[in-house]
UniProtKB/Swiss-Prot annotation:
UniProt subcellular location: Secreted
GO (cellular component) term, any one: extracellular region
Major location (coarse): secreted
Protein name: FMRFamide-like neuropeptide FLP3
Secreted recorded as keyword: yes
Organism whose genome encodes this protein: Penaeus monodon (Giant tiger prawn)
Highest taxon listed in the record's lineage: Eukaryota
Similarity section: Belongs to the FARP (FMRFamide related peptide) family.
Phenylalanine amide PTM sites in chain numbering: 9
Any single GO BP term: neuropeptide signaling pathway
Keyword annotations: Amidation, Neuropeptide, Secreted
Length: 9
């Protein structure tokens, strides 16, 4: 399962 939104820092 993959998150729909990935936070990029």
């Amino acid at each position: 399962a993959q998150p729909s939104m990935r936070l990029r820092f």
